[in-house]
Every structure is written in structure tokens, then in C-alpha cells.
Amino acid sequence: MSEFQLVTRFQPAGDQPEAIRQLVEGIEAGLSHQTLLGVTGSGKTFSIANVIQQVQRPTLVLAPNKTLAAQLYGEFKAFFPNNAVEYFVSYYDYYQPEAYVPSSDTFIEKDASINDHIEQMRLSATKALLERRDAIIVTTVSCIYGLGSPETYLKMVLHVDRGDKLDQRALLRRLADLQYTRNEMDFARATFRVRGDVIDIFPAESDLEAIRIELFDDEVENIAAFDPLTGEVFRKLPRFTFYPKSHYVTPRETLLEAVEGIKEELKERLEYLHKANKLVEAQRLEQRTRFDLEMILELGYCNGIENYSRYLSGRPAGAPPPTLYDYLPPDALLVIDESHVSVPQVGAMYKGDRSRKETLVEYGFRMPSALDNRPMRFDEWEDVSPQTIFVSATPGPYEAEHAGRVVEQVVRPTGLVDPQVEVRPALTQVDDLLSEIRKRVAAGERVLATTLTKRMAEDLSDYLADHDVRVRYLHSDIDTVERVEIIRDLRLGTFDVLVGINLLREGLDMPEVSLVAILDADKEGFLRSERSLIQTIGRAARNLNGRAILYADNVTGSMQRAIDETERRREKQIAFNEANGIVPKGVVKDITDIMEGATVPGARSKKRKGMAKAAEESARYEAELRTPGEITKRIKQLEEKMMQFARDLEFEAAAQLRDEIAQLRERLISS
């Protein structure tokens, strides 16, 4: 059985050795909840990796959003290259749930775009949990949403051993049951092709290997893994297990039982609606449900089949849905990153979903059983959560209430101390900030400025630009690709000042930033709470000359607590450095590292990454494009590559190609 093997050239330092020891001790003592209170840049992920290696337990890592999940995935993948590090997030690039607006009598159909690559990674994640102990699954709050039950999923699994007696037609029927499709032309994920007695199958959870089964007289003579692109055989296999294309696949007999249950509920609901004289709703419900039943009987599924999940999984009314947590072994470990954000998210999901569905049920678009197609409630999530470690620089009230032990990780391995915090009058904040920016720019350093409103951020950006400051503005309308580009440009020195509203949310990691300016710091509220202030101040904690300036006319309670906590940490860090003769060193981080994990690559997309180098060297051969026709053709080629990178979440590579396309378009106009 494989064990976790941590691969790193670093040794735990600063507060890390003691934090690792205490966390491991707490897990082995059976503590249900612990908190790792780790400051920005203290190496919390490295500490958790050491804990995982020592306790040797399958681990679920919960992040507050896809971007941070991707970063964590990249970091854990680097720490555990020989183990199963998987990525389980929502596979929707775009999702519009069905909804009804009674005030305007508007029904909005469900509309969604599924990311095929992330769907493959989700299947790979559950396969890893079912097959091996050395699994780390990095996920978001999507893990509390309904998933096919592991019992039903495992019933559908197809095992093939070398030497098995196996009729070819029976094998093809079983593959069809797993929702695999036969395709002789386009050999892609979850398809198979037949050439005489040779059957090539591309597993649903794989993006780099296909399986070849060779039959001889209804006996499995050979099983091999091969490259679906080149046909190169990697290795011979004694056996292989094929998993369904979807977590929601259901055996035929279960479908037939479900149909009977749905018919029974439909009959009861129609009686209720007729008695209430809701004739339009009754007619609508009957028409929609009977159409769905016909589709299920004919095809095995229908659009919106998840609304009948209670019957498909055999659950009683009101029971929690099967989720990713049902795939975890009993001794698993749960790590909640940025827990002050992640934990409240879990509670919010159920309420929003319930409100929308109740309207659909009331107006005859869905039956009451659709309410059981839902995320877990907060109390249900608490019941199924294994031993938990909350990880945050600013733990929230839930962590304070539940943590059996709080482990501090305040001293950084680099010896860097928290930034000095200074309070200055708000009256002259803009002019004072401008003079501070000039000092930092002269020293080759960068500045973050955070405001309260979008309008003020825009006005401040305009004002600084008018005074010859190279400034950019980061706001919610900027998509992920462009956000990565802006952050990279700041680090490269393309501009010097980044203005935003809620910069802490981005999980920014920029050692070049030496000053964080918080304007109107005394305006109490979400953006100026104690936790928000500590998080924002921490953005300057990776620079040797880090400093934070809070512009305020009054010192609020939140400000005072944030300043006191920063000062407490700073004193502890300085005392540790003096006692151990440590000279603080600045963090040196490659510019390309900023979104290392966001690529969430399989081996195939890793190979594609080499294409990004072409973007860097492109100037050399773009000069060879002479005619407008050649330039137009080149733009089309690059646009296709850019969209592929975006689909694979390789945002930096996509951003590079976008810049190149813009340059070519300028050439096209000028020519």
C-alpha cells in the first residue's frame, strides 16, 4: 500500500516544527477540531503537508474559491509528486439554475456549460478515494452538493482481468451501461472503439492513458495501457477497473423502481393542486413530469434528472444527499483553508438553494421531492465532517467556539516580521499616499491601496495617473485571466501601484509589495472589520521593508484590535529572531509562480505548457509575417490556442497569447 512521501528540499523552521508536532499530537489524541493560526507567509501549506505525511491519512482540503483551490492543488502536487493529489471543484464554466419569477411570470430554463477537463478530474478524485489511501483531494464548497451515492456508483463498476471469459457483445453492453459511447472517429474520454477482437477504451477519469483489451475466442488475452494519440503501449496490465462516465449513473432496475415512486408522488401532488384549484400548475406539472418519465425509461436519463435524486438514491424524504464526504474513509482528515471565509460559505449554500426551489414547487414546475436535491445543511455537514484542522491568519467565531486546540504559527521560516502599522489622518490621505508612493517607486518597490467604494477606487486611480504614477485598478468586473495578468505586471514592474476595494480576497502573494495603504480605515463594516484589516495588512508581510498605513480620523475598535494583534505577532517574531541570531531574508519568488496551481494540469496539458514558451519567443518569427493575410491567419491560430489554454485554466499562458494577438492586430491596422 502506498504511503505519503513528502518531497522537498526545505526543513521545517521558525514556528513550523512546534506547530506540526502539536497538530499531529492533537490528531492522534482524537481532538475533533484544531486551529492552525498562521500568519501570511509562515508556510501553513508546508506545515499541513508535514502533518499529512506523519499521520498517513487520506485528506480533504477545503478552499474558499477555485483560484485558491488551484494554488493549493499546485503546491500539494509539488510536495507529493508520487501520491494521488486530486482536484474536485464545480465542473460548470457557466451555470444558470432553473428558476421562476412570479412577479413577471418568467420561467428561466436551466442552462449550463460543463468543463470536460474538470469533470475528468472529479472522476479521478473519487476513484483515488475508492482505490487508495494516499489521496489528497483539494476541493471547494461544491463538495457539499449532491453526488451519486458511492454504493450505486460501485455497483456499476466493470472489472476486467486477464484470462476472464468475456463475450464481446456483453462487454460492449456493459460499457454502454457506464454511459460510454462507441466512436470510431474521435477517440476521446468515455468513448470506445472496436477493431475485430481488439477493443480500445478511453477511461472517463483519465486524460493521458487509454486501455486496450485483446480478446481471443471470448477470453481476455491481453490488457495494456497505451497513449491514445501515438498508440505507444506503456505497460501490460493484469487487470483494470472501469468506472462510470458520471457519478449519477444508475442501474436499470433502480431506474424502474424510481419511476414507480415518481408516478406515485405525481398522483398525490396533482390531487393536492386540483383541490386547491391550481389548475394551471397541475397541468404544467403533469406535462413536465410525464415527459421526464418517458425520457428516463427510453434513455436512462433526462434533463434535470437530479431533481429526482431522492428516488434514484433510495433516500427517505428530508435525508441528506450523498456527497463527496460519503466517499471518504472514516479516519480521513479535513483541512479547511481560510476557514474564516470557507465555513460561513457552507451554511449559506442551503438557504439560497431552498428559496429558489420552493418557488418552483409552489408554481407547478417541480414536485416537492425536488427539494431533496440540495446541498447539505450546516448541521448535516458538521455530522459527517471527520477530524478537522481550521487554517487561517484570522480565525472566525465558529473556529474559536469549536477548536479544541489553537496552534500558533507566527514566526516565519525566512525571519520576516509583520509590517509596521501606522495611523495617519484621513483628511490629507490622498496627498500623503502620493508622497509615500514616490518614495517606494524610487526604491523599486510596489504599493497596494485599498478603498471603500468602486467610485473612489476609480477616482484615486485617475488622480494618481494624472500625477505620472503608473497605476492600475483591480475590481470585480475583471475576469480571472486579466486579473492574473494585472498581478503579474505589478510584480514585473510594468506599473507600480495597484488600487482595489477588497484586495485581500484575491489571495495575493507579492513579495515586491512594501506598502499597503488602507484609506478610510475608520469606517466600520465588512471591509474594515478586524479580520479584513489583518488580512490586508498581511499583504505587505513578504517584504523586508513592509509597512501598512491606516488613514483614519478616529481609531475604531476593529482598528485597535488589528493593530494590537499585528504588534503582538511582530514582537514575538523579533524576539525569536534575536534569540536565534536570525537575519530576516526577503521572499524570492519567480514571477511565473503566481498562479502555479491554477493550471490544474493532467500530463497532456503539461505537455501543452511547452506551447507557452512559443509565446515568449514569438517576436522572433512574427517578423516573418509580411502580408495582412498571413497576419490574419496567425491571429486565428493564436486565438484557438488561447481558448484552449483558458479551458485548461492555464491563465498565464492565455494572457501571454492575448497580448501577442493585440500586437498583431495593431500591425494589421497599421499595414
From Swiss-Prot:
Q: Name one GO molecular function term.
A: ATP binding
| Keyword annotations of the record | ATP-binding, Cytoplasm, DNA damage, DNA excision, DNA repair, Excision nuclease, Nucleotide-binding, SOS response
Residues forming the UVR domain are: 632-667
Give the transmembrane region(s): none
Q: Where in the cell is it found?
A: Cytoplasm
What SMART domains does UniProt report for this protein, alphabetically? DEXDc (SM00487), HELICc (SM00490)
User: Into which family does the record put it?
Assistant: Belongs to the UvrB family.
* Identification of the protein by name: UvrABC system protein B
Species in which this protein is naturally found:
Pseudomonas putida (strain ATCC 47054 / DSM 6125 / CFBP 8728 / NCIMB 11950 / KT2440)
The encoding gene is uvrB
